[in-house]
Structures are given as structure tokens and as C-alpha cells.
């Protein structure tokens, strides 16, 4: 499960991953809240307890959650994740450097918003967003069910697909030549894509 934190809501996308990293979108939810109020973060706890039902009847629970900490509510996100690391709730931040691994070594963030040292600070994981997006968009091109194929529910709104495909890989001039970067279309929203990137990170954490 990937979580993107916005000013007035949590955007959440849950994926199931099978053999060969075949993927199924299980749920897309928008949870309206005030992320500045740490009490509202309990809404994510309620969501994490959701039990989804496989078509075979088997119950499926959320195995891991990655929460974006790069927005306006960094320390609230740190605090939430720090208290739940043993429950596989990961504090993450995107790293757009090319060729950056989806999962890199974590750094410990042990200073709170007031500059005070926190005992047992939160581990912050940097996610190679360009690499993850390469992987996601590559899978969207797989046409037959099986390894790498992506399944979607018929109940997903049009906005879901618009956000998932809101970025394009375009050439940009850099020192020494040209490089490709993932760029969001002007005025577009990409929360679903960000959540999916963080969900892919979770699969790497779970091995």
C-alpha cells in the first residue's frame, strides 16, 4: 500500500503482487483528513486493518504500507511511521536521480520539528522514483496476464487512470549531454502514480 499525503487528505492505493510480480489493483481510496492534526493519522490505522477478499474467498490483509514524507507534514509523517515500524509502516521520500535503486539504504531522522533529538528516530527510505516509474510503465505495456501484467478493477474511476499516466519520460539537457526524466503534464495530478511507486517499494521491502 502506498500513501500520498496532501493538504486535506490521504490518497491511498493498495496493490496485490503475485508470482513474477504480476499486479492487481485492490483498492483506491481518498481519505479526507487534516494531516496537521496527528489524531487524524489514526484514519490510516483503520485503513490498514481493512480485510480484502480474494475471488477464491481467501481473506487478504495489508502486509506493508509506505507513507510519503516529502510534503508539508514531514514530522507528522515521521512520528506516525516511527511508532509503527514494527508493523511494516515505512517512511519514504522520492529520489528522482536516474538509475537510483527502488530501495536504497535508510537514513535515521532523529530530530523533531523543534530541533530536539528523538530517541530511536525514524528510518527514512529514499525511493528511486525514476527507476520505479520505468518499471511501472513497462508493466503497463505487458498485454497478456502472467509475469509483470497489471490487472485493474472495473470499479476504478477515470481519474485513477489519468493520475497513473500523468507523467511522460522526456529528454532534458544536463551537464555532459542529454538525459531522460519523468515529467508531469502541466496541471495534472499524479497521486495515484506516486502511491503506486511507494507500493512497488513495499514489494521490494517484503522481498
Give residue spans per PLM region:
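Two-metal-ion RNase H-like nuclease active-site motif
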Residues: 1-6
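Structural motif
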Residues: 11-13
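Beta-propeller blade repeat segments, especially FG-GAP/WD-type strand-to-loop junctions
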Residues: 15-17
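Mg2+-dependent endonuclease catalytic cores in nucleic-acid-processing enzymes, primarily RNase H-like
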Residues: 21-175
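Long, compositionally biased intrinsically disordered regions
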Residues: 155-207
Amino acid at each position: 500500500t502506498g500513501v500520498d499525503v496532501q493538504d486535506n487528505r490521504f490518497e491511498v492505493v493498495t496493490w496485490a503482487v503475485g508470482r513474477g510480480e504480476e499486479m492487481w489493483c485492490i483498492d483506491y481510496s481518498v481519505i479526507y483528513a487534516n494531516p496537521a492534526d496527528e489524531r487524524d493519522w489514526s484514519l490510516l490505522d483503520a485503513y490498514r486493518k481493512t480485510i480484502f477478499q480474494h475471488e477464491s474467498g481467501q481473506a487478504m490483509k495489508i502486509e506493508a504500507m509506505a507513507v510519503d514524507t516529502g510534503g508539508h507534514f514531514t514530522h507528522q509523517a515521521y512520528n506516525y511511521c516511527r511508532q509503527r515500524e514494527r508493523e511494516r509502516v515505512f517512511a519514504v521520500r522520492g529520489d528522482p536521480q536516474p538509475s537510483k535503486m527502488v530501495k536504497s539504504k535508510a537514513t535515521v531522522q532523529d530530530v523533531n520539528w523543534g530541533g530536539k533529538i528523538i530517541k530511536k528516530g525514524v528510518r527514512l527510505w529514499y525511493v528511486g522514483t525514476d527507476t520505479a516509474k520505468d518499471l511501472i510503465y513497462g508493466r503497463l505495456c505487458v498485454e497478456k496476464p502472467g509475469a509483470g501484467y497489471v490487472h485493474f478493477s472495473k470499479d476504478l474511476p477515470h481519474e485513477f487512470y489519468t493520475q497513473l499516466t500523468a507523467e511522460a519520460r522526456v529528454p532534458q539537457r544536463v551537464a555532459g549531454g542529454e538525459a531522460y526524466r519523468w515529467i508531469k503534464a502541466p496541471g495534472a495530478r499524479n497521486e495515484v502514480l506516486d502511491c503506486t511507486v511507494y507500493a512497488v517499494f513495499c514489494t521490494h521491502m517484503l522481498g
